[in-house]
From Swiss-Prot:
GO terms for biological process: response to oxidative stress. It comes from the Bacteria. Belongs to the OsmC/Ohr family. The lineage of its organism: Bacteria, Bacillati, Bacillota, Bacilli, Bacillales. It holds the Pfam family OsmC. This is Organic hydroperoxide resistance protein-like 1. SUPFAM superfamilies: OsmC-like. InterPro entries: KH_dom-like_a/b, OHR, OsmC/Ohr_fam, OsmC/Ohrsf. Gene3D superfamilies: 2.20.25.10, 3.30.300.20. Disulfide bonds: none annotated.
Amino acid sequence: MAVQYETKATNVGGRKGHVHTDDNAINVDVLPPQQADGKATNPEQLFAAGYASCFNGAFDLILKQNKVRDAEPEVTLTVRLEDDPDAESPKLSVDIHAKVKNVLSQEDAEKYLQDAHDFCPYSKATRGNIDVNLNVEVVE
């Protein structure tokens, strides 16, 4: 299998530490969400940013493959860190909310969103591991 891309991130100090990528494009302090100070990020925000970007890229590709012009897709991804009744450690859940223009019907928009979910590498990586709720809104 050919590798299309590889990146590295290094953390020191865990959830109360610092993380950077090998190219320093990301170079930030990390704090748990409960200790947010407005300057540091947290793993959940980093996951949400990556997943939202990846998913919107997949959604845009699916829309273009289906000849939807000027769709201007927008994806907002909500990540929750929540209690897991089956384990001592918490778990993640995700809501993916998309907005799209110039789609003929809500039914088409939902199909394209599901196709994006099937295609997105983040969705593939999390499938069966976390709860993911999909929602799409057709806007003018």
